[in-house]
Amino acid sequence: MITFEKISNIWLENVSFDLQYTYQAELKNATNHLKAYFGERVCDTIKGLDVDEYIRYLSQHKNPNTGKPYSKRIFSDIIDVGCRIFDYALENELIDCRNPFYKKKRKIPKNAPKKERTPIDDIQKDLILKVYNRTQIAALIMLYCGLRRGEIIPLEWADIDFINKQIAVTKSVELINSNNYIVKPHTKNGKDRYVSIPDNIIPYLKLEKYNSNGCQYIYSQKCGKIHTASSWKSSWKSYQTLLNYRYYSDLMKQQEKTPKPYNAPTGIPVLVEPFTAHQLRHTYCTMLYLAGVDLKTASKLMGHSDVKITLDIYTHLDEKYKRLNIDKFNNYIAKDTTNQIFDIQNQKVV
C-alpha cells in the first residue's frame, strides 16, 4: 500500500532531472499543492469523487503562494500533474486502480479567474518614452521590437545593426538555479529571427551605446555583468517605482503643489500600475495588429513557434476591437432613438 506522497516524490525525481529549472519548479509547485491534500492517502483509495472534492476545496480557498483565488491556469496545472503522477504509477505497476484525475479538467470552476494578457496604456507608454533610467532601453526594445525578457538579458551591442535598423535575436537565457542564468544559442523556440527597429527608438539606442563605456551587453548590471534573476527583479521594481513617482510629481506640479520627496517615509501613492516585461511584448503584438501587419509576418516578428499562437492573440484582439467599434456605432445612433417610445405591450412604436 503506497501513499500519494511517496508516488509523487518518485515521479518528480524521475521526470525532472533533465528539465529546465523553471519547469522543474512549476512541477514541484503543483506536486506540493497535491501532497498538502492527498499526501498521506493510500493511492488505491483515492477516487474520482475525492478529486472532485479537492477541486471544490481549492475553489473555496486562496492560493497560499499568492493570497489570491486559484486561477484556471493553476487548476489546470495541478490536475495535469495529478493525472501524470497516477499514469506513471500505473505504467510502472506501483498501484492497481483507475486514474482518478482522468478528464477532471472539465471540472475546473467556470468562475475561476483567468489571467488576461493586457497591453500597457498610453500613460505607461508615454512614461517609458520620456523618463530616462538604465532600464528604459530594455523596456523600449521589448515594447517596440517585441523581445522576450529572456532575449533582452543576453542581447549585445554586436546584435544591433544600425545601418539596416535590425536586431539579430539569436540567443536567450535559461535559469539554472534560483538566481543564475546561462546563455543558450537560439531563442525560446529554437528559431533565430531578425526584428526591424522602428525609427522612434534609434536615438535612444545610439545614446545608450554612447554611454555604455564599451559594455558587451545592452542592458546589464551596473558592474557590466549579465543580469541574475534577483538583479533583474530589483532593477525592474526600481524602474516601476521611478515611473510612478515621475507621474505623481508631474501631477502635483500641474496642481501647483509640492510633491513629496522620492523616498518619503509616508510613501508615494500608486497612480501608475506596475507592468511586466511580458506586457510590453503583448503591447508590441497589439500594435502590430492595429497597424494592420498580416498574421504570418506578425508571427515571425514575435518569434512564435506556431502561427496558431499569434492567431489566438489576433482573434482575441479582433473580438475586443469589434466590441469597441459597435459601442462607437451605438453611441453614434443614440440620437436617433432619443425621442422614441416603445410600447412593449402593444409591440409598436408610439
Question: Predicted segments — roles?
Answer:
Residues 111-112, 173, 202, 302-328:
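Catalytic-site neighborhood detector that most strongly recognizes the C-terminal catalytic loop/helix
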Residues 64, 130, 145, 195, ...:
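Short, basic (Lys/Arg/His-rich) helix/loop patches that form interaction surfaces
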Residues 130-138:
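Conserved catalytic core of the tyrosine transesterase superfamily
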Residues 46-48, 87-111, 256-261, 327:
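Short, charged hinge/linker segments at domain and secondary-structure junctions
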Residues 2-5, 12-88, 225-231, 274-279:
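N-terminal core-binding DNA-recognition domain of tyrosine site-specific recombinases/integrases
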Residues 87-99, 142-173, 296:
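Short, charged phosphate-coordinating catalytic segments
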Residues 164, 177-194, 199-201, 223, ...:
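C-terminal secondary-structure termini that scaffold catalytic or DNA-interacting sites
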